[in-house]
UniProtKB/Swiss-Prot annotation:
Catalytic activity of the protein: UMP + diphosphate = 5-phospho-alpha-D-ribose 1-diphosphate + uracil
Source organism (scientific name): Campylobacter concisus (strain 13826)
Listed pathway(s): Pyrimidine metabolism; UMP biosynthesis via salvage pathway; UMP from uracil: step 1/1
Protein name: Uracil phosphoribosyltransferase
Cited SUPFAM superfamilies: PRTase-like
Cofactors required: Mg(2+)
Gene Ontology MF, one: uracil phosphoribosyltransferase activity
Amino acid sequence: MQNVKLISHPLIEHKLTILRDKNTQPFQFRMLVDEISYLMIFEATRNLKVKDVKVQTPVALADAKRLTTKVMICPILRAALGMLDSVFTIIPDASVGFLGFQRNEETAQAEFFYAKLPKDAKERMAIIIDPMFATGGTAIDAVKFLREKGVKEIKFISIIAAPEGLKRFSEIYPDVEVYTASIDEKLNEKNYIVPGLGDAGDRVFNTL
């Protein structure tokens, strides 16, 4: 799975350990999701396009670079909202395209219920964010939706992922890069990531 990029960094590993802990309180969980996302976005945006420009410093004229890639952040509602602020901190000029999927507890499949994209979505590189990448179903449906809307370049950032979901996704979209901080052991019989971190949405929004 050459499209899967495992981001390894001591700070991320340390914060992920606290994130997994069942005793971590919601306010701290939200903070950790934000901090880990902040660290991960650097790697996912490594290949953004830039152009050569001149900038006048207080001392002299300097050769410099300016971003030319227009970015659209696509959080998967609702858990990914906890990742959004950190991405905005790094890319304040990004647009946001909301994608709503809800897990059906009987089928363990994600059901689409909402989307709101900027008018120029097809001119932007989409970065889909979702803290958990389990079966891959939501990711597949999200990419399919964006492709149907004309979005050509897409990346996916997830804090933890299951190998089954990554394999399934990569077979369908080998050209879409997935960045994750951890590839966990497996999915259980309910399609929850093991060892995982529980329900990210419930822990972010304190709805346990």
